């Protein structure tokens, strides 16, 4: 799961790439590598913005990815689980998802243009504006 968070007022932003849904069953609960996990990483990323003075209403949040590239028979469904946990975290924090491009079997690349807040997606070699 690739996530872009951008503060429209402060013009600050961040990108995060999470690999698995939860750190719940890890020995250190994700402390050593929080951004690997959707649950711990999103909570930490949101808190970082809020600690820096951002208001929730000023945040643009976009998500891409969650492809099933190495799981063609759907055994693990890591991407689907990642997106489900991500949406629950947004809901619990009263945050809106402004745009997303998830699922399928193709890789994506996310670009955040800090000066403008535009968020671009590259999929199958094609660039398109996802938000902004």
Residue ranges and their predicted role:
Residues 19-24, 65-69, 103-105:
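Acidic, glycine-rich active-site loops and adjacent beta-strand->loop/helix elements
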Residues 38-45, 59, 82, 86:
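Amphipathic alpha-helical interface surfaces
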Residues 57-65:
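Short glycine-rich phosphate-binding loop at a beta-alpha junction
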Residues 68-80:
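Phosphate/ribose-phosphate-bearing ligand recognition and processing surfaces
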């Amino acid at each position: 799961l690739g996530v872009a968070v951008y503060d429209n007022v402060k013009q600050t932003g961040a990108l995060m790439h999470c690999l698995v849904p939860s750190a719940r069953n890890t020995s250190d609960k994700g402390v050593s590598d929080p951004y690997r996990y959707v649950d711990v990483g999103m909570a930490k990323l949101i808190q970082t913005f809020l600690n820096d003075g951002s208001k929730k209403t000023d945040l643009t949040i976009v998500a891409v990815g969650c492809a099933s590239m190495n799981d063609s028979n759907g055994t693990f469904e890591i991407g689907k689980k990642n997106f489900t946990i991500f949406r629950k975290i947004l809901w619990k924090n009263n945050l809106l998802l402004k745009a997303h491009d998830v699922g399928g079997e193709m890789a994506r690349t996310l670009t955040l243009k800090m000066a403008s807040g535009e968020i671009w997606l590259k999929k199958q070699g094609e660039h398109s504006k996802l938000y902004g």
